[in-house]
Amino acid sequence: DFIMGYKPSGEGFELQNGIFYKFCQKASNNQEVPYFFIIDEINRGNMSKIFGELLMLIEKDYRGKKLTLAYNGLPFSVPKNVYIIGMMNTADRSLALIDYALRRRFSFFAMEPGFSSDGFWQYLDSFNDDTFYALIEKIKDLNFEIAKDPSLGSGFCIGHSYFCGQDECTDEWMQSVVEYDILPMLEEYWFDEPAKIQKWQNILRGVF
């Protein structure tokens, strides 16, 4: 269904264009404009099977070159102005790894927690709350310990989004994030290290 697929139509099935096929057609008709196709949690599916025969066409050296589709016998190409962005959650161990055939067709960029970014510090400064500053520093310390843990790594670090989107900064809100989001996660991370869990419970609760 990603490229093409048979879907119910009346009393039977009809071959219909899939979302990526339609997207490429639209991009092909407007090649002066970049088109970005974003796949969230790309490693939830078997991308080699999903792209199938088109796997070669997403390579930069084959952009614009036509391939006859097995679905309908018609030529198809991936335009040069199509950019495929795949997002992965490397911390979810239940998900499939990206195989090498697909991996070599992509460049990779790690998105680290944005606690040190200019945007987050502007957000932090807008509250001018000493407790909030202190809590974020402790979270950064926590992330350092998570990142160096050989059983976890940087993919398991606490993201800044837990602390974003607030119009008002209160101790009640910060405590709720710690108690109901951060600490339960640490209990999963270090389920066999109760002393480490207790240590970070004391540190984070001690901010208040």
Which residue stretches match the model-derived regions?
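AAA+ P-loop NTPase catalytic core and its hallmark functional loops
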Residues: 1-152, 168-180, 184-208
